[in-house]
Amino acid sequence: MRIEKSGFHAYNTYLEEPPRDAGNETALHRHVIIIGGDKYSFFAHWSGKFAHKGERISFTWDWDRTGEFRNIDKSSFEAFAKDGAVQIRGDRTDKRRPAGRR
């Protein structure tokens, strides 16, 4: 099933698995998005949000085996800025994070 250019009510992230000795990049986060009272979710190794307030989002989703959870296909997730440009964020982006200044 597909959600097309929809607004969202809430977007929250929760730490699902803590980081290992290798660092925070191995930590697994659950991303939960609420649209029209329905919860959609996916897992990512990035804790930052894939969409920001005021943006429209599109994604493909399917029920889990129990029929209880709506799982987002992370690779299909798109956020649209106000000008309509597609924003690719998270661990799918090809841009490097800015380096800290020392």
Where are these regions (language model features)?
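Intrinsically disordered, low-complexity regions
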Residues: M1, H9-A10, Y40, R65-K74
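Beta-strand/loop nucleic-acid-binding surfaces
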Residues: A27-S58
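Short acidic/glycine-enriched loop/turn segments that link adjacent beta-strands
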Residues: N24-H29, T66-E68
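A structural detector for beta-sheet-dominated domains
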Residues: E4, Y11, G36, F43, ...
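Structural detector for short beta-strands of small beta-barrel domains
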Residues: M1-A27, I88-G90
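OB-fold/S1-family single-stranded nucleic acid-binding modules
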Residues: T60-R101
